[in-house]
């Protein structure tokens, strides 16, 4: 339950820095400003104006730090409440001391995400926009940031609003039919009903179809580099990273541990996993590396299967293919700078394949493009118009809405009662409303906002 009290927290990262910010929100923010902040001029704080002065202990009168303070009078603030921000020096101890004085002056310590939760509860943003705030903070690539900013600015919410508008129109028609059962249903009204439902279903379907792309942009993907020893797996990792991260020698079995690094390909964050070469071996340490590799395979979204193009495939290659059965693969034929001796078997002919030379850098751009196109199918992710669902919560609720819309259309065709059809429309509308927060239970809100840091 939302309690209209006053909360406070440090909004900047812990540790040393140039500036530390203590944020206060609630009805007591103006009085707290007067108690803990001393400035040269007298009188009330003017809203949205920065003042220079000192943070003081209200009991002893001691100046704790020189600082800047700004009071933002509601509703023109992040939370739509009175908000005070004190900008002091960024040391760990001084910001903690300023926060303690603010708490002593009447505020309580904010819970994780409570400032953004208040912005949501006070109607400044919807739940999709609130969730986008944490995505902005955690974005690792420009594309992930752009997607998060689009959602924070309300692009996805606008699409969902059009869906709910269509469903409300449809529900209004059905309820009118129910209220006046003695009247024959006008064929034009029934056609309008069908149009409203199909428009809503089409938009929901488009959003669900874009989920996979949205998810990988927000979360990234795990790409495992697999193959037998000495085919160039570590060299491929180094080439993609453009640095010597993994040890490369001519001795088979050099890599015996798992190496993970992040690579950004056109805004797509990749968690690259370099693994030990897979083969039958009696070496105890190498055998442990092979075991770790096999354990990593299930968590990979994509496997780059590296083969040596200068040698024929052998039993080790076939054993690896068997271990990778059912995985999404790109066949990477390395060492194209040497005479080609490999023959691609029929079962691999249709597999995506890129020929590279890690020693010369040949084919690396083509490999990057192939990886990108595996997950992003031509979407203009840098476009101002790009909108995608990126959270499982959103996808599942939209899928539930689709289920009810499908049941509605089937029921309409089968002559179900209007009351039953109205139930399906209400349930479809409620599912979409839960995405934006119109109908979201408090326990779900707790889960969402608990993921935020304190101070946001």
UniProtKB/Swiss-Prot annotation:
GO molecular function: GTP binding; GTPase activity; metal ion binding
Group of enzyme by EC: hydrolase
Note accompanying the cofactor annotation: Binds 1 potassium ion per subunit.
A biological-process GO annotation: tRNA wobble uridine modification
Domain TrmE-type G: 220-376
GO CC list: cytoplasm; cytosol
Keywords: Cytoplasm, GTP-binding, Hydrolase, Magnesium, Metal-binding, Nucleotide-binding, Potassium, tRNA processing
EC number: 3.6.-.-
Subcellular localization, as worded in the UniProt entry: Cytoplasm
Key word Phosphoprotein present: no
Chain positions recorded as (6S)-5-formyl-5,6,7,8-tetrahydrofolate binding sites: 23, 85, 124, 456
HAMAP family the UniProt entry points to: GTPase_MnmE
Function statement: Exhibits a very high intrinsic GTPase hydrolysis rate. Involved in the addition of a carboxymethylaminomethyl (cmnm) group at the wobble position (U34) of certain tRNAs, forming tRNA-cmnm(5)s(2)U34.
Description of how the protein assembles with itself and partners: Homodimer. Heterotetramer of two MnmE and two MnmG subunits.
PANTHER family xref list: TRNA MODIFICATION GTPASE GTPBP3, TRNA MODIFICATION GTPASE GTPBP3, MITOCHONDRIAL
Protein name: tRNA modification GTPase MnmE
Source organism of this protein record: Geobacter sulfurreducens (strain ATCC 51573 / DSM 12127 / PCA)
Lineage summary: Bacteria, Pseudomonadati, Thermodesulfobacteriota, Desulfuromonadia, Geobacterales
